């Protein structure tokens, strides 16, 4: 019994003490530029664009919680469209790698590409089917939503190999189905999930 108690005390003493939440805040951002060319006869066009700029704040609370808020400004539009707009605003409980809970407005776990960061896409944008199906720029006549929605999601990494790399990742969420910055208008929810073998 004494050995068990000593082990528990040693383990709790070794846990990393959480920094105050305000000391973990990070400011980041990026600007994406674009060049488009169309050589169709009668419809020739070529142009440089400032596609978008994003500014993000993120941080941790008590080591177990991660949060993020991100704004987007669209570039080279005559009216700025729906810009500036809030694209991410969420908190995620991350105590365990195998079971995390996220709530707020964030990327839907639909398709392989949608959850990926735009910078990880390289020079190419998302494929046309992903931009349509995940709700980037066509939502059956509804607003564009950058592949995001408001909801709650569980996710985790399973079956780690000898080097600690997860072999399976899963995500399952319930979302309003209306896109970003919009309440649920039809009272029906989207249930979206996936499992990735890596």
Where are these regions (language model features)?
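Cleavable N-terminal export/targeting peptides
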Residues: 1-18
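Outer membrane beta-barrel
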Residues: 16-38, 42-180, 185-192, 196-198
